[in-house]
Amino acid sequence: MNCSEVISNAAYILKENLIKNPYLDSEMLLSKALKIKRENLLTNLNMKLKNKDIIKFNKLIERRRKKEPIAYILGYKSFWKSNFKVNQDVLIPRPETEHVIEEVLKIIPKSASYNILDVGTGSGCLIVSIILERQRSHGTAIDLSLIHI
């Protein structure tokens, strides 16, 4: 089978199980299984797959079919302008949380130097994103669990 065929088959399975974005998830999971960027996958959809790669991909699809969040399967979540490592011990950054960053950036001028504290940092997405945008400021992130940091 080639990439296009396994993506279509997997997307059908995900769609039947009411997974949002079944094609996108299938492409991302095949990219993970093959250890290539999604862009490279999309330019090589006719590439024949090895049996071991199909087996690895099917295991990922099965996890997704069971409603495991795609971010946990991939091991990261895109947030603001970066990717953040996530697993079952860390809450997945939500897209609407990016509004917090937008509001903070309105308050803190680029030229200013602030000390920012992030309590209950989890993945660290908020503090890291803010400090990357306001590089003259300093951030401290704390969490009860060392697993999160």
Predicted regions and their residues:
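N-terminal auxiliary segments of SAM/dcSAM-dependent transferases
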Residues: 1-74
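SAM-dependent Rossmann-like transferase core, predominantly class I methyltransferases
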Residues: 55-146
